[in-house]
Amino acid sequence: MLKREMNIADYDAELWQAMEQEKVRQEEHIELIASENYTSPRVMQAQGSQLTNKYAEGYPGKRYYGGCEYVDIVEQLAIDRAKELFGADYANVQPHSGSQANFAVYTALLEPGDTVLGMNLAHGGHLTHGSPVNFSGKLYNIVPYGIDATGHIDYADLEKQAKEHKPKMIIGGFSAYSGVVDWAKMREIADSIGAYLFVDMAHVAGLVAAGVYPNPVPHAHVVTTTTHKTLAGPRGGLILAKGGSEELYKKLNSAVFPGGQGGPLMHVIAGKAVALKEAMEPEFKTYQQQVAKNAKAMVEVFLERGYKVVSGGTDNHLFLVDLVDKNLTGKEADAALGRANITVNKNSVPNDPKSPFVTSGIRVGTPAITRRGFKEAEAKELAGWMCDVLDSINDEAVIERIKGKVLDICARFPVYA
């Protein structure tokens, strides 16, 4: 018999210890990985609920199982909130991840072998936008586009590639691009050749929801996002659209279920619903504005300290530090900062001479530190510490000194107060 007092700590000490150690790590490390964030206790409450027990294949009102009257309410709340938040008239909240959402869009709109324009991974794109190691690069004929010498998307080259290759789809979106994308221009290019414009806004969805970054929904045929990252919800995916046909929406739904998934994760969908409600609050807008301010503040310090930032700045939550001129690898920088309890990720930079496993850059993002309460002053101080470590990458005394400062500021700005 199941009893409510059952717990992991008493039953599985080995697992519980690892979970507790991760909790401590999150509190005592500064998180600067651009795709990571801290979700609210409300979201975690939803994910740890009895909704995890319920199978609900199908969609609200059209399920293959009985007993779905309450999970229908949960999913419909998530759908309605997603549509309201992003100005969409279609939303599918079932994708288990951003990659699953992207797979569903490709399945709905493309045939294997179709030509697709996607942002070059080395220029800031994402694995699922046509990388040869990913399903997207294996199933479709991918033509990459990239950034120009200033570090911004080269729309002239994009248009030229589009007219030359006549792709069935153009993919907008990125995983390591710090500029503002001109969604209207991309739609104009797509329309000129009769292609779909599909936008993956996973990285900037929270900024979009708060009006801090341009919304692609009015411009794209289809938009996907993750529900974590800047949106600060549970790990999962979401598909949105506006002004499309019922036929398109049926195709998208069918591509998710039964095309790519079986039963939806109702406990995660409940987490999405509450996160979407949180994203409608005034304080969420203030938070996203601060995310962007903190990123700019950090860039300022890196530039002052003689570090090169790809595209020279940032207009969102992330930026890339190019370490080629410093004769450092991203792998070395990642490891040294990690020893100071500062977590970043190594990242390729444009025309990177190193392999993707070594790289010549680091990606820095501000969603998590801002969630802790950091403002510009703390962001600048942190950037200075990072430069101290990178300037003396083999000096363990410097790294230890910075680690002490990190532990102090983490205690002053707890993740969960």
UniProtKB/Swiss-Prot annotation:
Chief subcellular location: cytoplasm
GO cellular component, one term: cytosol
Sites bearing N6-(pyridoxal phosphate)lysine, chain numbering: K229
Annotated positions for site Plays an important role in substrate specificity: H228
E.C. code: 2.1.2.1
Organism of derivation: Shigella sonnei (strain Ss046)
Primary enzyme class: transferase
Location within or outside the cell: Cytoplasm
Cofactors that this protein relies on: pyridoxal 5'-phosphate
Free-text function comment from the UniProt entry: Catalyzes the reversible interconversion of serine and glycine with tetrahydrofolate (THF) serving as the one-carbon carrier. This reaction serves as the major source of one-carbon groups required for the biosynthesis of purines, thymidylate, methionine, and other important biomolecules. Also exhibits THF-independent aldolase activity toward beta-hydroxyamino acids, producing glycine and aldehydes, via a retro-aldol mechanism.
Location of N6-acetyllysine modifications: K54, K250, K285, K354, K375
Pfam families named in the record: SHMT
Pathway: One-carbon metabolism; tetrahydrofolate interconversion; Amino-acid biosynthesis; glycine biosynthesis; glycine from L-serine: step 1/1
Protein name: Serine hydroxymethyltransferase
Catalytic reaction list: (6R)-5,10-methylene-5,6,7,8-tetrahydrofolate + glycine + H2O = (6S)-5,6,7,8-tetrahydrofolate + L-serine
Gene3D superfamilies: Aspartate Aminotransferase, domain 1 (3.90.1150.10), Type I PLP-dependent aspartate aminotransferase-like (Major domain) (3.40.640.10)
GO BP annotation list: glycine biosynthetic process from serine; tetrahydrofolate interconversion
Family designation: Belongs to the SHMT family.
Residues that bind (6S)-5,6,7,8-tetrahydrofolate: L121, G125, H126, L127, S355, P356, F357
PANTHER family: SERINE HYDROXYMETHYLTRANSFERASE (PTHR11680:SF50)
Gene Ontology terms, MF aspect: glycine hydroxymethyltransferase activity; pyridoxal phosphate binding
